[in-house]
């Protein structure tokens, strides 16, 4: 009598074959892609944000864009700190990194805004769309202009700053939830293609 492996073992072997095929397809498509890019936003730097974005090629007319922005700084009595992640999909009408594109994107932000006597802390979750244009400066450098708008849901807390709480004042915390229509992207960016 011949011993057969259990049925679940056969499924694992098939899953390994499928996984190998999927990895091979991604490897082939990645080697087919001529270049990706790294960029930084000048408007973000002017606002005091440390920022960078990575673009990964998907095909001839599409790229995956992953920008990250961080601002951990305080200026005297004012605080405007945040971490923002905005993954998006860019569809290029001519070819990657050339000409006009549209870009739907998601947004996640964790922020603290403190000024005057109040501090606001919260998260923001949103979705938006932007339009942009990329101009080739040289073989490896591009200049990108992008502007976008979106809807953001933000649950946050509002507190009176502790140094402003007097002897007879009560410390309070308000909890808010809001939907906001906001400009989500305002980019003047230099992009390096590799």
Which residues does each PLM region occupy?
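Positively charged n-region of N-terminal signal peptides that target proteins for export
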Residues: 4, 10-18, 34
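Bacterial N-terminal signal peptides
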Residues: 20-27
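Outer-membrane beta-barrel "beta-signal"
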Residues: 180-194
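Extracytoplasmic loops and strand-loop junctions of Gram-negative outer membrane beta-barrel proteins
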Residues: 35-37, 113-116, 168-174
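Gram-negative (and chloroplast) outer-membrane scaffold detector with strong preference
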Residues: 56-145, 190-192
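Short, solvent-exposed beta-strand-terminating loops
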Residues: 147-161
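Solvent-exposed loop/turn segments connecting transmembrane beta-strands
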Residues: 37-53, 74-81
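Sec/Tat signal peptide C-region and signal peptidase I cleavage site
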Residues: 29-33
């Amino acid at each position: 009598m011949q011993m057969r492996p259990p049925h679940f073992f056969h499924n694992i072997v098939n899953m390994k074959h499928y996984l190998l095929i999927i990895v091979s397809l991604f490897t082939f498509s990645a080697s087919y892609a001529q270049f990706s890019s790294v960029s930084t936003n000048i408007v973000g730097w002017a606002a005091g944000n440390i920022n960078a974005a990575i673009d990964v090629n998907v095909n001839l007319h599409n790229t995956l864009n992953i920008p990250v922005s961080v601002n951990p700084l305080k200026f005297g009595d004012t605080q405007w700190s945040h971490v923002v992640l905005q993954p998006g999909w860019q569809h290029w009408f001519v070819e990657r990194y050339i000409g006009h594109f549209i870009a739907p994107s998601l947004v996640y932000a964790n922020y603290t805004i403190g000024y005057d006597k109040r501090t606001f802390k919260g998260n923001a979750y949103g979705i938006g769309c932007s339009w942009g244009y990329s101009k080739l400066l040289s073989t490896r450098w591009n200049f990108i202009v992008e502007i976008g708008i979106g809807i953001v849901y933000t649950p946050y807390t509002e507190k009176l700053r502790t140094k402003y709480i007097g002897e007879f004042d009560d410390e309070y915390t308000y909890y808010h939830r809001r939907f906001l229509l906001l400009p989500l992207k305002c980019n003047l960016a230099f992009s390096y293609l590799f």
